[in-house]
C-alpha cells in the first residue's frame, strides 16, 4: 500500500486548519514541469516557467523529476486524495536548470537563483526547492560564486528545501552547509546531478 507524502507528514492536519499554501509561490530549480491536470487551472497555478537549458517558452519536463517534486508539494489531487500535495493552493514557479538526463551546469543554476532574486516579489516566492546535488569540486571559485548567489537569497528570508544525501561515488550536495544555520528544510534525496 502506498501512502502519500502529505499523509506521511500529516499535512492533512494543516489542510483541515486552512493552511493550503494560498498566496505562496514555490520556486523549483529542477528538470522543468509538465502541465499535468494536478496543477490546474494552469493559468493561475503555474505562475511562471523559465527554461535556462533550451530557452523554450512553454512548460515542459523532459525528465520527469521536476514534475514529480512539484507534485509532492503542489498537487491539487485531481486523481484522488492520495495525491494531494502539501501546499495544493500554492502557485508554481518552475525554473528548468537541468536537462533530460538530470544533468546541468552551474551557470544555469546561477541564472535561476538570479531570476528568483529579481522576481521573488512579483511571484510571491517564499520557498525555493533545490533538488540538485553536484560532484565534489576542488574549484573554490565556483563554490564561492554559488554561495554568493545563495547568500543574496538568504537575506530575503526565503525557506530553502534542500536534498540531503550521503557521499556516494564522490558525489555530494552542493556545499550549502551554511544554509543549515539559516532558514532551510532538509529532505532525503538521491543523486540526480552528475
Regions found by a protein language model. Name each.
Residues 76, 97-182, 188-193:
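Substrate-binding/access-modulating region of protease and related hydrolase catalytic domains
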Residues 1-3, 56-61, 194:
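Short, charged, surface-exposed secondary-structure boundary motifs
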Residues 1-2, 39, 51:
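Generic N-terminal leader segments that precede the first folded domain
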Residues 13-28, 32-48, 56-107, 121-126, ...:
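Subtilisin-like serine protease catalytic core
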Amino acid at each position: 500500500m502506498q501512502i502519500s507524502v502529505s499523509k506521511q507528514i500529516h499535512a492533512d492536519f494543516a489542510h483541515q486548519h486552512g493552511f493550503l499554501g494560498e498566496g505562496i509561490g514555490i520556486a523549483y530549480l529542477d528538470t522543468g514541469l509538465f502541465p499535468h491536470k494536478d496543477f490546474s487551472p494552469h493559468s493561475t497555478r503555474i505562475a511562471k516557467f523559465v527554461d535556462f537549458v533550451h530557452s523554450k517558452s512553454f512548460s515542459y519536463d523532459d525528465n520527469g523529476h521536476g514534475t514529480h517534486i512539484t507534485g509532492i508539494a503542489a498537487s491539487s489531487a485531481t486523481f484522488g486524495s492520495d495525491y494531494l500535495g502539501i501546499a495544493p493552493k500554492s502557485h508554481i514557479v518552475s525554473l528548468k536548470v537541468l536537462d533530460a538526463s538530470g544533468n546541468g551546469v552551474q551557470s544555469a543554476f546561477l541564472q535561476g537563483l538570479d531570476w528568483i532574486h529579481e522576481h521573488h516579489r512579483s511571484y510571491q516566492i517564499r520557498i525555493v526547492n533545490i533538488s540538485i546535488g553536484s560532484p565534489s569540486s576542488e574549484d573554490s571559485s565556483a563554490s564561492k560564486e554559488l554561495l554568493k548567489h545563495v547568500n543574496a537569497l538568504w537575506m530575503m528570508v526565503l525557506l530553502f528545501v534542500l536534498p540531503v544525501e550521503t557521499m556516494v561515488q564522490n558525489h555530494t550536495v552542493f556545499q550549502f552547509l551554511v544554509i543549515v544555520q539559516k532558514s532551510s528544510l532538509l529532505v532525503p534525496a538521491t543523486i540526480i546531478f552528475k
